[in-house]
Regions:
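Substrate-binding cleft/loops of secretory-pathway carbohydrate-active enzymes
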Residues: 103-104, 161-209, 231-239, 439, ...
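Helical hinge/lid and interdomain linker segments adjacent to catalytic or ligand-binding clefts
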Residues: 33-42, 46, 50-72, 344-441, ...
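Aromatic-lined carbohydrate-recognition surfaces of secreted/lumenal glycan-active proteins
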Residues: 22-29, 77-85, 113-119, 148-181, ...
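Active-site clefts of carbohydrate-active enzymes
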Residues: 190, 209-241, 265-278
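Mature N-terminal, pre-catalytic/accessory segment of carbohydrate-active enzymes
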Residues: 15-82, 95-120, 131-143, 306-307, ...
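Carbohydrate-binding surface patches
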Residues: 305-341, 391, 402, 413, ...
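A glycine-rich, often tryptophan-bearing local segment used as a flexible ligand/cofactor-contacting loop or short
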Residues: 402-492
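Aromatic-Pro/Gly-enriched surface loop or interdomain linker
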Residues: 287-392, 529, 616
Length: 623
């Protein structure tokens, strides 16, 4: 099969002469001592070394790695020395920790930090019991969400405080794949997230979350631990290598720094294969890494993180982190905490990167932009994001669980009054602190300031389908066929409270029949409440967004929200192309197709556009 290498083109004269600002490298296992670092230097695989334990590191081993780093202008990150599941150092470091820290402190000038609490989301939230050491998890049994949240905060703070007391060099870096764990870590003492990029449907969700959380907590960068060798598939054929190459450039496009190989520099030990340094496959792994490192060295990326216009809010007391998680807040032995509709709602983030079919009646406008969100990416942001950072987003969407409180409520009202748009459901105005607690309306159901509605004590199930009666003022376009049309979403049936309307405009109503002379007002299902310069689009459902009865309607609303954001640049392309936009106006375009070229149109303004051709696997940087 013909080999299609990743091509890269920089459309800016002279830029390749600048020094790269993105570090590339690999993971260095202790059993090879300095050999991996030396290989990275000798074969031009980058300048970044992440020390990893296969047996303990000792001071003499560290000095050998440091010598290679200094001789070759390289940096390194220290492996974890503290137990992930218990307070204190790993037993293997009990006798040598003081000497190790002395070596690290003397060489802090070429250190990029220390690994702390690796795989935190897996250990505490997501792994099945059989995967955790000795069949146990770190997270204790709890009965409420707030107990779990407090334990997580304390766990991170205790570990980082202890690391400080030992004198371990900062920044403290946590590596892991669970998208929902990043905010928990950054909130309580971790300085940087390096995403363990496990491949599958959550790839973009991880990037959305790490970028959003990093921005929210004032972190300048995040890294990517490229775990393609473990999680990219077991058959290393040509399509596998195309995925491998694409994963490097995709990390670059999304703003990662550093970017490094989890394995494959010195050996390959994954699944059923055990390959040594000189095995042809391992040699090829290194070549692909070297090609990427060489390109990055010639092509600096804009400073900062990619822009986003739309954010999904990770709510208060949301104990879902993704990946293999089966129970909220890591309560694997308590079936009351099993994940459900709130958690399944996060699938919508992944669908923001899926193009709607040519035969979809939902797509509106003059140009087809579905398949990539506005500005090429969405962010997932924590509920405690500062107001000034929240204001950077044009639209904020609630998906998973949220326990509303006064501080968040006031922040949302202020955000909307200054021009923001929120999409949410009554479910997100819950205050329940336990899976056993029924929906408990925030502020006794008086949501008039935010939504224009006041929830009453009664509950009822939406009986009919949906007819849209009006478009909101924020630019979203709904299907409006008048009164004589078939109802939409007739497989609905979500639960909602009885309520009073105190100033919200109705956008959709329930309908059971096609032929009606006027819209029924018996069952109003969607509202817009204007506050100052912005508005809240509100569905009164107390059923979770991810429940079968609400998911189709809510996904439709999310897609109309993405479609309605008017921000430039806009890129007209298939979902085989991924793109990002930076603050200086730079646009990065990546063709992820293996053997198919693409032509895209970059709309830089309403009157200025240009066509760009992308070869298979090509990355272009347009300034």
């Amino acid at each position: 099969m013909k080999k299609f290498a990743i091509l890269a083109c920089l459309l800016l004269a002279g830029c390749s002469a600048k020094k790269s600002n993105v570090a590339v490298g690999g993971l260095c296992e202790s059993k090879y001592v300095e050999q991996t670092a030396q290989t990275i230097a000798d074969e031009g695989l980058g300048t970044y070394n992440v020390l990893f334990r296969k047996g303990p590191w000792n001071p003499d081993m560290l000095k050998k790695v440091i010598k290679v780093c200094r001789e070759n202008g390289m940096t390194f990150t220290m492996d974890e020395v503290m137990d992930r599941q218990n307070h204190g150092p790993y037993q293997i470091y009990q006798d040598s920790l003081t000497q190790i820290i002395e070596v690290l402190q003397k060489n802090a000038d070429i250190m990029d930090g220390t690994l702390v609490l690796g795989e935190f989301g897996g250990v505490n939230f997501a792994w099945p019991v059989t995967s955790a050491r000795k069949g146990t998890a770190s997270m204790p049994a709890v009965s409420t969400y707030s107990q779990a949240d407090a334990w997580i905060r304390n766990r991170v703070k205790t570990q980082t405080d202890y690391a400080d007391s030992l004198g371990l060099p900062r920044p403290y870096i946590s590596i892991g794949p669970e998208f929902g764990a990043y905010s928990h870590l950054l909130r309580s003492g971790i300085d940087r997230i390096d995403v363990e990029m496990c491949f599958g449907e959550e790839t973009e969700r991880r990037y959305a979350s790490v970028i959003g959380a990093s921005k929210a907590f004032g972190k300048e960068r995040f890294g990517v631990d490229n775990a393609m060798l473990w999680y990219g598939g077991e058959q290393q054929d040509e399509l596998w290598f195309q995925r491998y190459r694409t994963s490097w450039y995709h990390a670059y496009l999304r703003g990662a720094n550093p970017i490094y190989a989890e394995h494959g520099v010195t050996n390959y030990n994954a699944y059923i294969k055990r390959l040594d340094t000189d095995d042809p496959l391992v040699v090829r792994f290194r070549k692909e890494l070297g090609d990427f490192a060489s390109w990055v060295a010639k092509n600096p990326r804009p400073e900062g993180l990619p822009r986003a216009a739309v954010a999904f809010m990770q709510g208060r007391m949301d104990g879902y982190v993704g990946s293999w998680q089966t129970h909220k807040w890591g309560q694997r032995l308590n079936e009351d905490f099993r994940i459900g509709g709130d958690e399944r709602a996060w699938k919508i983030v992944d669908q923001c990167y899926e193009r709607e079919g040519w035969n979809s009646r939902d797509v509106n406008g003059e140009i087809e932009l579905s398949g990539n969100p506005p500005l090429g990416t969405v962010n997932v942001i924590p509920y405690d994001i500062p107001s000034e950072e929240l204001a950077q987003y044009k639209v904020v969407i609630f998906l998973g669980y949220n326990a509303m409180d006064d501080e968040l409520y006031a922040k949302l009202v202020n955000y909307v009054s200054e021009g923001g748009v929120i999409l949410m459901a009554a479910r997100h105005l819950d205050t329940a602190d336990s899976p056993l607690q029924n929906f408990t309306a925030y502020n006794g159901g008086d949501w008039t300031e935010l939504t224009g509605l006041k929830a009453l004590d009664g509950r009822r199930r939406m009986k009919f389908g949906v007819k849209f009666t009006a478009n909101p003022s924020c630019g979203w376009k709904f299907h409006q066929y008048g009164t004589a049309c078939d109802p939409w979403f007739t497989d609905g049936g979500f639960m909602m409270p009885e309520f009073e309307n105190h100033g919200a405009d109705t956008l959709a109503v329930g309908a059971e029949v096609m032929w009606e002379k006027k819209f029924s007002t018996d069952e109003c299902l969607l509202f817009e409440h204007k506050i100052g310069k912005g508005s809240v689009i509100f569905c009164p459902s107390i059923s979770p967004v991810g429940s079968p009865e609400l998911y189709p309607l809510y996904l439709y609303l999310v897609r109309r929200a993405l479609e309605g954001v008017d921000v430039y640049p806009k890129v007209e392309c298939t979902d085989g192309v991924r793109w990002s936009c930076y603050e200086d106006g730079t646009v990065l375009l990546l063709n992820t197709e293996y053997h198919v070229g693409q032509e895209v149109i970059v709309h830089q303004s309403p009157t200025k556009s240009r066509k760009i051709k992308l070869s298979p696997g090509e990355l272009k940087v347009i300034r």
